């Protein structure tokens, strides 16, 4: 466990979050979020960090991924039922900002074949990039299902203009152990991104969508 958050504290907070949810069942699957408050950081002067880490358990089961594929990838995905678009379908959007925005909204992330990825700015314009959803590369040596799972399990920390950030680390149907392991990975990775590591952390909380925040640090 990371030195500043004891195993006991983590398990206790996770139990509180999960039990709070059991008391009040919602009609949707609540996400569990890690909320971070930073200190001794100047977003104007200090380098704004950004980084991604893969968690052990998928934090958002409903996270949707669309493959922008060449012929081979489009044929492959038929067997595994993954949403896809080929180059012709992308060209039909005709760089229309509204349509590209709609596409960016429809899916949480995109994968693209090698032959397509370089053409995306030309075919679609900057829409996907602006939405922070520029596709990740999908090569022919990779298993498509495994790659989609990897994208679903990966979270991104990105420092913006404010000193707080939040990322999804799980959901309320997970076991204590799954959630603890994900939070542990996420916290350690985040701290490694910070200039002064733990000295930049003011507070850490976890909370479910509708639940009360539980302090870890």
Curated annotation (Swiss-Prot):
<feature type="modified residue" description="N-acetylserine">
    <location>
        <position position="2"/>
    </location>
</feature>
<feature type="modified residue" description="N6-acetyllysine">
    <location>
        <position position="106"/>
    </location>
</feature>
<dbReference type="InterPro" id="IPR023674">
    <property type="entry name" value="Ribosomal_uL1-like"/>
</dbReference>
<feature type="cross-link" description="Glycyl lysine isopeptide (Lys-Gly) (interchain with G-Cter in SUMO2); alternate">
    <location>
        <position position="118"/>
    </location>
</feature>
<comment type="similarity">
    <text>Belongs to the universal ribosomal protein uL1 family.</text>
</comment>
<comment type="subunit">
    <text>Component of the large ribosomal subunit.</text>
</comment>
<dbReference type="Pfam" id="PF00687">
    <property type="entry name" value="Ribosomal_L1"/>
</dbReference>
<dbReference type="GO" id="GO:0098794">
    <property type="term" value="C:postsynapse"/>
</dbReference>
<dbReference type="GO" id="GO:0005739">
    <property type="term" value="C:mitochondrion"/>
</dbReference>
<dbReference type="GO" id="GO:0140242">
    <property type="term" value="P:translation at postsynapse"/>
</dbReference>
<feature type="cross-link" description="Glycyl lysine isopeptide (Lys-Gly) (interchain with G-Cter in SUMO1); alternate">
    <location>
        <position position="118"/>
    </location>
</feature>
<dbReference type="GO" id="GO:0005737">
    <property type="term" value="C:cytoplasm"/>
</dbReference>
<feature type="modified residue" description="N6-acetyllysine; alternate">
    <location>
        <position position="118"/>
    </location>
</feature>
<dbReference type="GO" id="GO:0045202">
    <property type="term" value="C:synapse"/>
</dbReference>
<comment type="function">
    <text>Component of the large ribosomal subunit. The ribosome is a large ribonucleoprotein complex responsible for the synthesis of proteins in the cell.</text>
</comment>
<protein>
    <recommendedName>
        <fullName>Large ribosomal subunit protein uL1</fullName>
    </recommendedName>
</protein>
<keyword id="KW-0689">Ribosomal protein</keyword>
<dbReference type="GO" id="GO:0002181">
    <property type="term" value="P:cytoplasmic translation"/>
</dbReference>
<dbReference type="GO" id="GO:0003723">
    <property type="term" value="F:RNA binding"/>
</dbReference>
<keyword id="KW-0963">Cytoplasm</keyword>
<keyword id="KW-1017">Isopeptide bond</keyword>
<dbReference type="InterPro" id="IPR016095">
    <property type="entry name" value="Ribosomal_uL1_3-a/b-sand"/>
</dbReference>
<keyword id="KW-0832">Ubl conjugation</keyword>
<dbReference type="InterPro" id="IPR002143">
    <property type="entry name" value="Ribosomal_uL1"/>
</dbReference>
<dbReference type="InterPro" id="IPR050257">
    <property type="entry name" value="eL8/uL1-like"/>
</dbReference>
<keyword id="KW-0597">Phosphoprotein</keyword>
<dbReference type="InterPro" id="IPR028364">
    <property type="entry name" value="Ribosomal_uL1/biogenesis"/>
</dbReference>
<dbReference type="GO" id="GO:0005829">
    <property type="term" value="C:cytosol"/>
</dbReference>
<dbReference type="GO" id="GO:0005840">
    <property type="term" value="C:ribosome"/>
</dbReference>
<dbReference type="GO" id="GO:0003735">
    <property type="term" value="F:structural constituent of ribosome"/>
</dbReference>
<dbReference type="GO" id="GO:0098793">
    <property type="term" value="C:presynapse"/>
</dbReference>
<keyword id="KW-0687">Ribonucleoprotein</keyword>
<feature type="cross-link" description="Glycyl lysine isopeptide (Lys-Gly) (interchain with G-Cter in SUMO2)">
    <location>
        <position position="161"/>
    </location>
</feature>
<dbReference type="InterPro" id="IPR023673">
    <property type="entry name" value="Ribosomal_uL1_CS"/>
</dbReference>
<feature type="modified residue" description="N6-acetyllysine">
    <location>
        <position position="91"/>
    </location>
</feature>
<feature type="modified residue" description="Phosphotyrosine">
    <location>
        <position position="11"/>
    </location>
</feature>
<keyword id="KW-0007">Acetylation</keyword>
<dbReference type="GO" id="GO:0140236">
    <property type="term" value="P:translation at presynapse"/>
</dbReference>
<dbReference type="GO" id="GO:0022625">
    <property type="term" value="C:cytosolic large ribosomal subunit"/>
</dbReference>
């Amino acid at each position: 466990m990371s030195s500043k958050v004891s195993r006991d504290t983590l398990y206790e907070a996770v139990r509180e979050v999960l039990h709070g949810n059991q008391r009040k069942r919602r009609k949707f699957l609540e996400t569990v979020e890690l909320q971070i408050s930073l200190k001794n950081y100047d977003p104007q002067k200090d380098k704004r960090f950004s980084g991604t880490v893969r968690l052990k358990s998928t934090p958002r089961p409903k996270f949707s991924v669309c493959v922008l594929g060449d012929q081979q990838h489009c044929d492959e995905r038929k067997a595994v039922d993954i949403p896809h678009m080929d180059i012709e379908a992308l060209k039909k959007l005709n760089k229309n900002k509204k349509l590209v925005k709609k596409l960016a909204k429809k899916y949480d992330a995109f994968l693209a074949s090698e032959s397509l990825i370089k053409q995306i700015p030309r075919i679609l314009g900057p829409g996907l990039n602006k939405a922070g959803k520029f596709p990740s590369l999908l090569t022919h040596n990779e298993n498509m299902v495994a790659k989609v799972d990897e994208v679903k399990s990966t979270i991104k920390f990105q420092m913006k203009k404010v000193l707080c950030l939040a990322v999804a680390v799980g959901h309320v149907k997970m076991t204590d152990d799954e959630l603890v392991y994900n939070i542990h990975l996420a916290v350690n990775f985040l701290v490694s991104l910070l200039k002064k590591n733990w000295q930049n952390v003011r507070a850490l909380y976890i909370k479910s969508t509708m639940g009360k925040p539980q302090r870890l640090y």
